[in-house]
Curated annotation (Swiss-Prot):
Domain notes: The histidine box domains may contain the active site and/or be involved in metal ion binding.
Stated family: Belongs to the fatty acid desaturase type 1 family.
Entry protein name: Delta(12)-fatty-acid desaturase FAD2
Motif Histidine box-3: positions: 315-319
Gene source species: Vernicia fordii (Tung)
Length: 383
């Protein structure tokens, strides 16, 4: 969902699964970042305050309409219908608020406007309302963009080598175990990452997004971590007061369950962008920024592509040019695809099927036996 028009690109012809899973090239590409930038129309790099705010206003208006209908009319429904109405509200509100999350993420990339302070204020407010420590995540996410697909320095969804996987992993490599793992990942994955750095880069000591003195941050970033914590605490206190006034069940139904859906979509989207049998990871002997940025996948979420402001199907372009606003990313993707060629990876597999397949196929990474490129690692599932 979004305000104003947006260029749409017809989806590419549907590939056979064997083509989708075919490994992308891992050698140094025959093009440069500068050549890719020249192929993109200059206006795609322009950020408009009014246009960016129009998406904020649109999303928040839709979210308010859903909230108003739920809180003013659902109690009038016969009980069987209310059992249907609330799950519909949770799903719709969760999707819309995921779009709000994406806009706040864009603020963290300085892609919302030409004014860094404005971007940070908008991002802080929106992310805090979704219980996200804005600056804390902004800084760790920036390092993810600087080190994508590096086994040593990437910040999140860092795959394990075969020698590092836990002993119980092979016992979870079956349908019931996979369902259990995915359920935990989608429901608890985001808060566990923020609080305990689960699935994040290993540090030499405890790492937490709420700790200003943790190893994730530098001395000059610590004040902003305090600000992020204050934002989350302020919203948490507001929710406490709401629960005291309206009841805990009201807060859970109106806010809590949609937030769980936001968190689940966030984990799913980022997991599928960086986890695929066709894309490589690199150790320090092979990694470079451009190849790392290209080790990402554009996905198709159907109508949700629009609701999520195309973060799902323009992620390759986003990793190459992260300060580009989302409303130009489709046009930019269309412009660079002919240059990227086989280095561009798109997978139109429905996201629910892709999530199951990747959980099955992408257990750990290892280098190919006999390959001269010992620093290039591919996903594997064989124990």
């Amino acid at each position: 969902m979004g305000a104003g028009g947006r260029m749409s690109v017809p989806p590419p012809p549907k590939k056979l699964e064997s083509e989708v899973l075919k490994r992308v090239p891992h050698s140094k590409p025959p093009f440069t970042l500068g050549q890719l930038k020249k192929a993109i129309p200059p206006h795609c790099f322009q950020r408009s305050v009014l246009r960016s705010f129009s998406y904020v206003v649109y999303d928040l208006t839709v979210a308010f309409i859903f909230y108003y209908i739920a809180t003013n009319y659902f109690h009038l429904l016969p009980q069987p219908l209310s059992y249907v109405a609330w799950p519909i509200y949770w799903a719709l509100q969760g999707c819309v608020l995921t779009g709000v999350w994406v806009i706040a993420h864009e603020c963290g990339h300085h892609a919302f406007s030409d004014y860094q302070l404005l971007d940070d204020i908008v991002g802080l407010v929106l992310h805090s309302c979704l219980l996200v420590p804005y600056f804390s995540w902004k800084h760790s996410h920036r390092r993810h963009h600087s080190n994508t697909a590096s086994l040593e320095r990437d910040e999140v969804f860092v795959p394990k080598k075969k020698s590092s996987i836990r002993w119980f992993s092979k016992y979870l490599n079956n349908p019931p175990g996979r369902l259990f793992t995915l359920t935990i990942t989608l429901t608890l994955g985001w808060p566990l990452y923020l609080a305990f750095n689960v699935s994040g880069r290993p540090y030499d000591r405890f790492a937490c997004h709420y700790d200003p003195y943790g190893p994730i941050y530098t001395d000059r970033e610590r004040t902003e971590i305090y600000i992020s914590d204050a934002g989350v605490l302020a919203v948490t206190f507001g929710l406490y007061r709401l629960a005291a006034a309206k009841g805990l069940a009201w807060v859970i139904c109106v806010y809590g369950v949609p937030l769980l859906i936001v968190n689940a979509f966030l984990v799913m989207i980022t997991y599928l962008q960086h986890t695929h049998p066709s894309i490589p990871h690199y150790d320090s002997s092979e990694w470079d920024w451009l190849r790392g940025a290209l080790a990402t996948v554009d996905r198709d979420y159907g109508i949700l592509n629009k609701v999520f402001h195309n973060i799902t199907d323009t992620h390759v372009a986003h990793h190459l040019f992260s300060t580009m606003p989302h409303y130009h990313a489709m046009e930019a993707t269309k412009a660079i695809k002919p240059i990227l060629g086989e280095y561009y990876q798109f997978d139109g597999t429905p996201f629910y099927k892709a999530m199951w397949r990747e959980a099955k196929e992408c257990i750990y990474v290892e280098a190919d036996d006999g390959d001269e490129s010992k620093g290039v690692y591919w996903y594997n599932k064989k124990f």
